[in-house]
Regions:
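Glycine/small-residue-rich loop that forms an oxyanion/phosphate-binding "nest" at active or ligand-binding sites
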Residues: 69-109
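Active-site-adjacent beta->alpha loops and helix N-cap segments on the catalytic face
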Residues: 16-22, 41-53, 121-128, 147-157
Length: 256
């Protein structure tokens, strides 16, 4: 049986004179990019440059909308009602769609950022509003969402293309959610351990949780990082390991 998987990373998170991440380098190793849309990070010039780099390197572009929280990098919880969430989506995804249009690039997907992502996974009213906003911009844009989450199931029910995402460097609970960053087992730091877990998720549809149980999981795309040279090496190790195991690493626009 042939196995395919996408590798995605959050990019375009610099702002003004401030630089975050090694975007040009990480684009050599991933197949999809989640581009910040100016609220938790990014700005119009960064968005423009990131879409251009993605086109040059053949990396699929996704919108990465977050809460309007530059100071907290979009990681702080906010009280957001459904009408606000829908408008946030239209505003940010629509902006990145315009940059993609200017380069003749297809906007492949949308992936929420930080607290927006985490809350939408477990809050149906917020998830519904997010999907309403996505469909209002373009119903053909895929929703890249936490594997097995409410928002994944609701997007499938609506007929929205769904990319179920897993994480190379994070631990999972028995419920299929990520172990909170403040708890033991939240992070997988050893590259070989991470690779073995990713291979299990991709080829067997299983993952071992922080309690030692094995649960089902769907791995359409694996999130990796490019914050520094160590993260780049980690990402390269995962990609090379997948290829050696016979897994085809490709985005959803380049699959045969």
């Amino acid at each position: 049986m042939s196995h395919y998987v996408d590798l995605n990373s959050d990019l375009g998170e610099s702002f003004g004179n401030y630089t975050l991440g090694m975007d040009s380098e990480v684009l050599n190793h991933v197949t999809s990019a989640n581009v910040a849309c100016g609220w938790h990070a990014g700005d119009p010039l960064i968005m423009d440059a990131t879409v251009r780099m993605c086109k040059e390197k053949g990396v699929a572009v996704g919108a990465h909308p977050g809460y309007p929280d530059l100071m907290g990098f979009g990681r702080r919880a906010m009280a957001v009602n459904p009408a606000e969430a829908k408008a946030y989506m239209i505003y940010q995804v629509g902006a990145l769609q315009a940059f993609c249009d200017s380069y003749g690039v297809t906007l492949q997907h949308m992936k929420l950022h930080g607290a927006f992502y985490n809350t939408a996974c477990v809050t149906p009213a917020l998830a519904d509003a997010v999907l309403d906003g996505l469909q209002a911009v373009n119903p053909n844009i895929a929703a890249m969402v936490l594997s097995g989450s409410y928002i994944a199931k609701e997007a499938q029910r609506r007929g929205i293309p769904v990319i179920q995402e897993v994480f190379a460097d994070r631990g999972y609970t028995d419920e299929g959610t990520l172990v909170p960053r403040t708890e033991p087992g939240a992070f997988i730091k050893d590259p070989q351990e991470a690779l073995e877990r990713v291979l299990m998720m991709v080829t067997e549809g299983k993952v071992v949780t922080n309690t030692g149980n094995t649960i089902d999981i769907v791995a359409d795309s694996v999130c990796v990082h490019g914050d520094n040279s160590e993260a780049i090496a980690f990402t390269n190790y995962i990609r090379e390991g997948l290829t050696k195991a016979g897994v085809t690493v490709a985005n959803f626009q380049n699959r045969k």
